[in-house]
């Protein structure tokens, strides 16, 4: 599938989802039990995962998949939101932003795997 025709849409929608993640993570930092915020972050990560996968951006897909998994654990009560987790999530957001900037500049997400974030 030739995805080049969808690149501009992908970039615009990714910017929106990253802004949502940023806004909601700031709320989560202050209100770690806020279920609406937790659900909003889960949905944004899920949407980004699907979009990245469709476009073939595997690194972005993997990172958002891992973020989605974390929020599924939080939603199910198996994990609590702690300051250390929020810090890791902000690092993940920074990595996603870097992937997007690479995509904007080169149409490629780059080669950084961000294993240290994924394994944190």
Question: Model segments located where?
Answer:
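N-terminal assembly/transducer modules of large multi-domain enzymes
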Residues: 1-120
